[in-house]
Amino acid sequence: PEWVEKYGQKAAYFCTNDAHTEPLLKQLLEYGGYFIEADLPSPLMGYPGALGLDLTEEAGDFEKILNKVESAIVEKGGADHFGTWAYSYGYTLSAGLALHAKNVLDGKSELLDMDDVAAALQGYSPKAAWNGAGYTNATTGVKSDNVFLIYQDTYIMGDPGHFMGNADVEIPEKYFTIS
């Protein structure tokens, strides 16, 4: 409540300590503010506890999980103020990168092709777009061939909810070396 009083209801909040996500969500639902996504984005990160949701019946089905979380957010007046990756970070990266490795071994994909990586991730997140680029050392300007920074388009919960389109944004190279 102090931060909302200080910064207002139009401020966006973020935390890197997962244990703080649930209480932050509860307070933002009560006092106002924005929460675009967690550091490990997922509809499972903080939302079920903050909203008092039992997701037993939806377990393993991220579209149903997101729908239930989104309905609860809208019901509590948080439409267009809360976001997440529609498909869990942990799940999609684990399953998607395993599929990418299999595709590489089967000769269907190139190991260091970002489009091939994104296509494998898409298999476990069918409605979300992906983007990324090779990591660039900000100090030296050297771009890594085998380390990617990847991200899923952010989903903003609402009535209706929508993807932000951030996976379609081309980041200018000049920003890769800001230090």
Regions found by a protein language model. Give the residues of each.
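A residue-level marker of the well-folded mature domains of exported/periplasmic proteins
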Residues: 1-179
